[in-house]
Amino acid sequence: MKVCLVGSSGGHLTHLYMLKPFWENKERFWVTFDKEDARSVLKDEKMYPCYYPTNRSLKALLINTRIAWKVLRKEKPDVIISSGAAVAVPFFYLGKLMGKKLIYIEVFDRIDKPTVTGKMVYPITDRFIVQLSLIHI
């Protein structure tokens, strides 16, 4: 099984890294911002940089959609996993069109409402994981 782990740097990346017991023995690659914290955490991992800031702009969406198209066609993952943020959206929608399994993990610090990214990818995910049950989509 080949795994794509996609997310913003910082807390989102930390959430994905905490899944190490799941992904450590699988073929994998990461998609995140090319920032010092990400380079440090993923120094021994295959990583593709994505465009930032994503700040929900059309420009960022188009650039990251192009990146997603290239990376997904090259790597051909079986599953795409994300905990957000916006960079996950093009990877999930293109991944769905390519027949990939999609797993979204809503960040645990959201206690009363879902993230914007969570709401955007919810309709197409194969597994949507909410860490606190107070959230209603």
Describe the function of each predicted region:
Residues 26-63:
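Short, surface-exposed acidic-centric catalytic microdomains
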Residues 28-34, 106, 129-131:
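Short internal beta-strands
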Residues 94-108:
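Active-site proximal beta-strand in glycosyltransferases
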Residues 1-33, 39-42:
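N-terminal subdomain of nucleotide-sugar transferases
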Residues 79-98:
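An aromatic- and histidine-rich active-site surface loop
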Residues 56-78:
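An amphipathic, basic-hydrophobic alpha-helix
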Residues 103-105, 113-129:
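A conserved, positively charged/aromatic
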Residues 135-137:
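Conserved small/polar residues in nucleotide/adenosyl-binding loops
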